[in-house]
Amino acid sequence: MANIDTPIPALKLNDGNSIPMLGYGTGTAWYKSGDEDKIDEKLVESIQTAIKLGYYHLDGAEVYKTEPELSMAIKKSGVAREKLFVTTKVITNIADIQNAIKTSLKKLQLDYVDLYLIHAPFFAKTDSDLQRAWAEMEAVQSSGLAKSIGVSNYLPQHLEATLKTAKVVPAINQIEFHPYLQHPPLLAFHKQHGIATAAYGPLSAVTKAAPGPVDDFMKALEKKYAVSAAEISLRWCIDQDIVAITTSGKGFWTNKFDANDRS
């Protein structure tokens, strides 16, 4: 992981808050299948390193059981809370969202999160289930426990159902997004309703899906700009105003190819 040479750009959400467009994830790659109380020291060290190098957007979730590690890394970093942007998600305790956020905050040892997401819509058997859950999310925001609220893995039909009764439009929808999974109709829906997009798995085309159709194009760009395929993948997201969340430990921006250079 390389030092950030220029500040990471921020995207203004529909509620007026801003989100850093590059986030460090503590998700699937770090999922704990065992006891949540057993601290993964490697993850703590990884998050600390990310923070030290300027990656202040930290993305977690209750289901990954890594909120304690995130808390420990934040505390050890010594970085002021107001400089950090912390996201967590609810799904395990979706039936009681207002208690779920309190549990997450206790594990994170924080008074609030910057962004709270419903992790997936698949708990819902009816539109009413989606609407009830979103009403609870709105209550969480009203209580001050989350500055912004949003969803993850929602498709247009889930968003449509939610918006029918929503008082607050979701600030963001975090989805799997990379060159092989671009979701044109969903992104169009987001744009129509002022919902920002965040991408998880943005490096999939150059990691999990390689070799593939974009390989030659990536190699040409790597040679042209003297940067890595990972940097190109992240820049591709940011150039589309899509927040990129990655668990990669490799370097991202360089002097020649940085987050603020839109040429």
Pin down the residues of each PLM region.
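A short, structured active-site edge motif that brings together acidic residues
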Residues: R81-I94, L115-P121, F177
